[in-house]
Amino acid sequence: YTLPAKDVADFVKLVERADLTGLPAIDAVSSARRPLLAYGALVLDELIKRGKPRAVIISAQGVREGLLHEQLSEEERAADPLLRAARDYNHLRARDPRHAAELIAWSRAILETAGLAGDEPSPRLIESVCLLSDIGWRAHPDYRGEQSMNVIAHAYFTGIDHVGRAFLALAIFHRYAGLKADSPAANALRALLPTPILDRALLLAAIFRVAYLLSAGMAGLLPRMPATCVDGRLILRLPEDLAPLASDRVIGRLKQLAKLLGRDYEIARL
């Protein structure tokens, strides 16, 4: 949890002075720890004054997690915790876990040829959202978007901040529910995202909506149907034996994706 240092300094001053019984949500703090709050606030206040940090990062982990982390091998410690968790979800919940690797490459080809392969969101977030893109397939179609969004918003992921988590959750919400779908929970997550990151979440959702309609989540198909941006057009290339996949639904979603990219679309033969 990352907060501006000024916000933390203002809060600890409030805790130092306030009657604890009057603080909102004080019931969330155990009665045994409440008498120590003012002392902890004083220490944190002094740390901020002396260290002059721009931001304060509060770990979501605790002593027990740290003890377990110390017992891991160096190789395990070096692993990216977010990608590890996303791969686990993909392995446990996707129809065909092999499909995610192909989707990563397929999505990157579109982003790179569209000139959108920048640093925001980071490549690891792009990879993670691809790995999480099929976790809701077992749910009823009417609820897949909302359920998948809630799973990601509350999952025990580490190595990710609030903006990154909201990006993942909203991209998968719109992948299932549609690009114009809405809900109170989705609105709350949108409030966390800068406009460029929200736009990228919608773009990834649009890419997934085309990819899954073409591949049904099965490995071995997307590499045979490359999609790239060339000379102001989004071009989907289909081999002769897969040409019947160019249904009205696929064309509609391809047109929607091309619009987000600011391009025309074309379906060509390989």
Description of each model-found segment:
Residues 212, 256-259, 270:
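Intrinsic structural disorder
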Residues 228-230, 239, 268:
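A structural detector for beta-sheet-dominated domains
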Residues 234-250:
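A short interface-forming secondary-structure element
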Residues 54, 261-270:
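A short amphipathic beta-strand at an alpha->beta junction
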Residues 245-265:
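Short, non-transmembrane amphipathic alpha-helical segments
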Residues 1-218, 225-234, 244:
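Helical "lid/coupling" subdomains associated with nucleotide-phosphate turnover
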Residues 216-222, 260-263:
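Short secondary-structure junctions
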